[in-house]
Regions:
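FIC/Doc superfamily catalytic core
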Residues: 1-155
């Protein structure tokens, strides 16, 4: 909710409609709650388990808007907590990432390969974090400004 509360009145609320992006239909509303319960129960103690959980959350797409951006942050938080790494998103090509995510419900080897090759142990590096946010918006088609150019952000 915090990420999008100033933009969408439905921010942080589980969606109440079926949604699709392009030709991909996300989890039907009638199965969404059980899908989220199953995701919550999934293990997350290894890189592979974390990515499998991330893929399932992408398929669930619990919100009407902001799923990709918020789940990439969620992914990094899980990786940081469980295995001591985060993704350096500046090393992940947009087209490769989007294609791998589109195919990931069938075969997750591509997304695992892409993300594993972009892992860094600089988990507390603010620059990597901010570049990750920039890339997250870039993946979604936003190009307005870079986080590093904002001067009024406080630690």
């Amino acid at each position: 909710k915090y990420l999008f509360e100033d933009i969408y009145d439905f921010a942080g609320k589980i969606r109440e409609v079926n949604i699709a992006k392009g030709n991909f239909r996300f989890a039907p509303l009638m199965y969404l709650c059980s899908a989220l319960e199953n995701i919550d129960k999934m293990p997350q103690s290894s890189f592979d388990e974390i990515i499998e959980k991330y893929v399932e959350m992408n398929v669930a797409h619990p919100f009407r808007e902001g799923n990709g951006r918020s789940t990439r942050i969620w992914l990094d938080l899980m990786l940081k907590k469980e295995i001591g790494y985060v993704v350096d998103w500046s090393k992940v090509d947009k087209e490769d990432y989007l294609l791998a995510m589109e195919r990931s419900p069938i075969k997750d080897i591509e997304i695992k390969f892409l993300l594993k090759n972009a892992l860094t142990d600089h988990v507390n590096d603010r620059e990597i974090y901010m570049k990750g946010i920039d890339h997250s918006y870039y993946y979604e088609g936003y190009y307005v400004f870079k986080m590093e150019n904002l001067t009024d952000i406080k630690d």
